[in-house]
Amino acid sequence: MAIKVGINGYGRIGRNILRALYEGKHGGAIKIVAINDLGDANTNAHLTRYDTVHGRFHGDVHVDGDSMVVNGDRIRVVAQRDPTKLPWAELGVDFVLECTGLFTSKAKASAHIAAGAKKVLISAPGGDDVDATIVYGVNHGVLKSSHSVVSNASCTTNCLVPLVKVLHEKIGILAGVMNTVHSYTNDQVLTDVYHSDLRRARSATMSMIPTKTGAAAAVGLVMPELKGKIDGFSIRVPTINVSFVDFTFTAARKTTVDEINGAIKAAAGGALKGILAYNDQPLVSVDFNHDPASSTYDATLTKVIEGTLVKVCSWYDNEWGFSNRMLDTLLAWSKAA
């Protein structure tokens, strides 16, 4: 029997999760039965059909009353600000995909459980109280059926951690700094407006904007042995999608470009296939749009200085890759003991 899912928040990630479900491999195992979003059903249906970044949805989408019908599947659309009043119990929802960016702690996300859902998967870094922070492909084995609220980390953490896992296991990482060159998102502004972060107050369309990110520090939540050893920052850039992780670290022993590239290539074709991909072509960001991998390593950019100072780089579709991992984590959790 398919897992019944409700999506709370039908923005960039919520919509891409739905599209990824219908375009991908989990269609028979997962069934979206409801969407909670403050937009009306007609607008949400239109935004499902047509997408500036990912193109037209090649399926049938129409509205019937208070429902959006996708390829014959009826999905109820509600607009409720208070998650405790959502119809999860009535609809028999097993899992809620919390995609608003607002209910990121266990305390807040548990409002969905009060409304009748069994479990909540947060599409953002979670608070200290969540049961687990998961990067699928690296630590999804820690999921337990007893968990009620889990974080799927961030798109950037999902790009970085698979690289870190391979490099730490094969070579050893003493300490590292990450920079993500990140496409702008809708929490930025089109024109200059007031913001407590003076750089974030500036137009996303005109500048490269340095800002903070918790993605690097979150590595320690997934790989506790590296807690406190990796930090980083972000530079938001005027592109609409696809981002880039630039990770520099001190290796525990001497290594070479060939060894590092070989280790990543082996993992991308083996244990991390589908999560970590390998590229040796001179590509640019648009070439990775709509790529479902969490992380596509760019072997052309690897640098090693004096054997122990190492730089590696990886591309990621910060929308599509992460949305696919939400589905992967959901399915893995549903099967956990």
Regions found by a protein language model. Give the residues of each.
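Generic secondary-structure signature for well-ordered alpha-helical cores
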Residues: 22-26, 165-173, 183-186, 213, ...
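Catalytic core of tubulin tyrosine ligase-like
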Residues: 170-234, 240
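C-terminal active-site/capping subdomain that shapes the small-molecule cofactor and substrate pocket
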Residues: 232, 244-337
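Short, flexible turn/loop "capping" segments at secondary-structure junctions
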Residues: 142-144, 200, 237-243, 304-307
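Generic structural signal for well-ordered, non-membrane alpha-helical segments
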Residues: 10, 14, 105, 153-156, ...
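Short, solvent-exposed beta-strand edge segments and adjacent coil->beta transition regions
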Residues: 146-147, 203-205, 242-246, 309-311
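N-terminal Rossmann-like NAD(P) cofactor-binding subdomain of oxidoreductases
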Residues: 1-201, 328, 332-336
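Glycine-rich beta-alpha junction loops
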Residues: 38-41, 126-127, 154-156, 180-187, ...
